[in-house]
Amino acid sequence: MRAPGMGFFRMPLFIWSLYGTAWIQLLATPVVGITFLMVVADRLLHIGFFDPAQGGDPILYQHLFWIYSHPAVYIMILPAMGAITEIITTFSHRTVFGYKAIAMSSLAIAFVGYLVWGHHMFTSGM
């Protein structure tokens, strides 16, 4: 909850980084849950999502793994980057140069970090 009169571009940069992280978690976490259910169904019910002998695709597992695991890196680093920015500005008694650019880049990192899992798939084929 923001204080009265606090607009979006007056919030601390830590909050911007948490906002980007929240969107990544909201979009990426269901994928890991679905992947887990598919692996359980594959192992216990012998459905064959990932078994080539049953018509499955092992590359699908790699895609589902990286669709979650690549954004997970940014889930860990974005809040730390926001916290470090706040700590440095607080103890140096200075304002942040390029506040809007840093706020938007936090969201851009979250957005792009979610979309670029494919670069992990170059060696196995897309």
Where are the regions a protein language model picked out?
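Membrane-embedded and interfacial regions of multi-pass energy-transducing membrane proteins
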Residues: 1-126
